[in-house]
From Swiss-Prot:
Subunit structure, interactors included: Monomer.
CC cofactor: Zn(2+)
Enzyme Commission number, as recorded: 3.2.2.23, 4.2.99.18
Name of the gene this protein is made from: mutM
Name listed for the protein in its UniProt record: Formamidopyrimidine-DNA glycosylase
Species of origin: Nitrosococcus oceani (strain ATCC 19707 / BCRC 17464 / JCM 30415 / NCIMB 11848 / C-107)
Length: 271
């Protein structure tokens, strides 16, 4: 699933090509995504212009003249900018055609993505108003994590992946941040002190920042808006490296399922 760095990479890729452009037409080939694409979307968007491209957690916010498109890439979604004469593929479900002969094409093989429309403040939309703070903003720090982890019985890994606690931290980057912080993913969130949470907040920010700079992580099918893979996979310390030696101590990296998600850790370096 595209996580925060991948979504931010897409945002940066499409923004300069959308802002100021008018929407000529909208083509919906398959409306049955995670939630059906609203039938009114086609008519609502024609003639509007893009004003900005934002992000909240893993959601893209395409601000238009009269409202906002809220788009989630789901498990396998991608956005590409193509010319209008580019043949569409089997999983190209939506085209937003611009007035310059190009179109924003949404591809989603597994159809877990979503495209919503709101004319109200998008941050008050039910999908967004429940989200915790952005992990790269100042509100997200060790004091915040310590305060919100008290009396929680969940594991620290599940805790930092809870989008109500912090927006956009998925499985890949949770594994990496916990490794760099030296915290075992199974450790109870309520049994971690302030100093260790300060370290975890720092490593989370570092991992996410570095991933954004590398264009995200491509493990299976993530591509940037210009069709290129993300290169942070080359920098992963622990994710996907089961039985490989720990880059710090050489102990074989262990893999187990925690909360139905693949969790990688070093038995010597993480406690």
């Amino acid at each position: 699933m595209p996580e925060l760095p991948e979504v931010e990479t897409v945002r940066r890729g499409i923004e300069p090509h959308l802002v100021g452009r008018q929407i000529h037409t909208v083509i919906v080939r398959e409306s049955r995504l995670r939630w059906p694409i609203p039938l009114s979307l086609t008519q609502n968007l024609i003639g509007q212009s893009f004003l900005a491209v934002g992000r909240r957690g893993k959601y893209l916010l395409l601000s238009c003249t009269q409202g906002t498109i809220i788009l989630h890439l789901g498990m396998s979604g991608s956005l590409r900018l193509v010319t209008t004469n580019t043949p569409h593929g089997k999983h190209d479900h939506l085209d937003i055609v611009l007035n310059n002969g190009r179109c924003l094409r949404f591809n989603d093989p597994r159809r877990f993505g979503s495209v919503s429309w709101t004319q109200a403040n998008p941050l008050h939309h039910p999908l967004l108003e429940i989200l915790g703070p952005e992990p790269l903003e100042s509100l997200f720090d060790g004091h915040y994590l310590f305060k919100h982890s008290r009396h929680r019985r969940t594991s620290v890994k599940a805790f930092i992946m809870n989008h109500r606690i912090v927006a956009g931290v998925g499985n890949i980057y949770a594994n990496e941040a916990l490794f760099l912080a030296g915290i075992h993913p199974r450790r109870s969130a309520s049994r971690i002190g302030l100093a260790r949470y300060q370290r975890l907040a720092e490593t989370t920010k570092t991992v996410l920042y570095n991933a954004i700079q590398a264009g995200g992580t491509t493990l299976r099918n993530f591509l940037t808006s210009d069709g290129k893979p993300g290169y942070f996979a080359n920098q992963l310390q622990i994710y996907g490296r089961s039985a490989h030696p720990c880059p710090i101590c050489g102990t074989p990296i262990r893999l187990e399922r925690i909360g139905q998600r693949a969790s990688y850790y070093c038995t010597q370096c993480q406690h």
